[in-house]
């Protein structure tokens, strides 16, 4: 049960004052980094700015306290922005709350059922494809604010394609003042990390953006122009629940759960490499579930482990969950004291921050490398996941991407299964290699290589017997697995052979195929004496058969 033990309990056993100081310092620095990001991601998700802070506070605290990683920092992430925006637009905040709670329940169940290790079975091409697709949707969604565009009344695009069309159709309404603020903010975000190692570039960009709007004659929309800002602490809210609402929320909940699991465990793996540690994936999933449930009930949005914030925590000395807890407490203080000033942040600055977030998450170098080096089947899955994410949504991308990946994998595996006949030789055959074994004319040997499953069962049809054949030997030393479809094909082969008076002998059947054969009663059908441990014994048995 150690896999379901919070890392906080383990960390406290050897905790000391020196590490506490490092954790507090790291927690405060990460909170400063998380502040502008949480606000920007909340706005990109179609909710109020305080919802992002609530998420970082509530989910961040719960996930740090219960998590299976000693350094994970959780909060709102860019991966959820387009999903959340779509849910809010269609189902409202109550729909989002229900979907997030259900996702939290799914995550808890995944952890309790020890599904943590199963996440690795999601292909890398799918995660790369939809991550790059999300980055593109974020950029397209922020073009309006970056250029200060004005849309006609009633035009509120939801889908990415609709947003792009609206940008193109209304580009003539560009606000040069907004473009100047956005361009300066973007330049600061790019240059600041090279100059200021400790101060996050997003915070510097926010301060400069506020100063530009407040002290220069620039007509630019700010958060305060579009949203009501509150510095009140998160309060408990339980939405009205009905069977129909829950049923409608299930697909979105599943997507949120899968994405939260993937991103949080990926963050844990990256963190393990940085601190030479090992996380508890099952406990991390339980914590992610509890954190998302708590976040939804206290006015937040979906949360998961954030790689950038986790890396910042590690680089600043954080080594235990105390750093994550301090990060949440610091954000509570910031919420109460500084939140009213958030209304002064220009929208183009928010857009610029999200452009950088999108760039950092798009993995374009990995994308290009896969296109150049990956097999064609993987490239198909990569582009399918990418395009479907941009044109539709993440639900469609993951579902179709997984189905496509499975089908292409089945095709690839079926191509690795071969049935080859041994070369028949006798004393009258000229130029015979010495290593070839001479066999009587009545014995025919086939060697099967690769997994025998439904995608490769048809290869058994390649086994051909002659009129003079009295014994067929099937060498299966290279068959690691057998399923019911292939088992049925073998039964058909044996029955056809028996009808022709041909005995079938099996050589070197591995453990898994043998279990399937025994369970299906196949060993009784063939006869246990016709299952031999190696080819020499099988050929000896074949000679006994033709001698009878």
Task: Give the residues covered by each predicted segment.
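The feature marks cytosolic C-terminal regulatory regions of anion transporters and related permeases
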Residues: 360-525, 543-546
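Short secondary-structure boundary/hinge segments and terminal tails
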Residues: 290, 331, 515, 534-535
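Generic hydrophobic alpha-helical segments
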Residues: 84, 164-167, 460, 464, ...
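Active-site donor-binding loop signature of nucleotide-sugar glycosyltransferases
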Residues: 231, 450, 534
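Short acidic-hydrophobic, aromatic-tinged amphipathic segments that line or gate anion-handling sites
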Residues: 525-541
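Conserved SAM-binding loop
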Residues: 73, 506, 531
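Transmembrane helical cores of multi-pass ion-transport proteins
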Residues: 1-424, 468, 489, 521-522
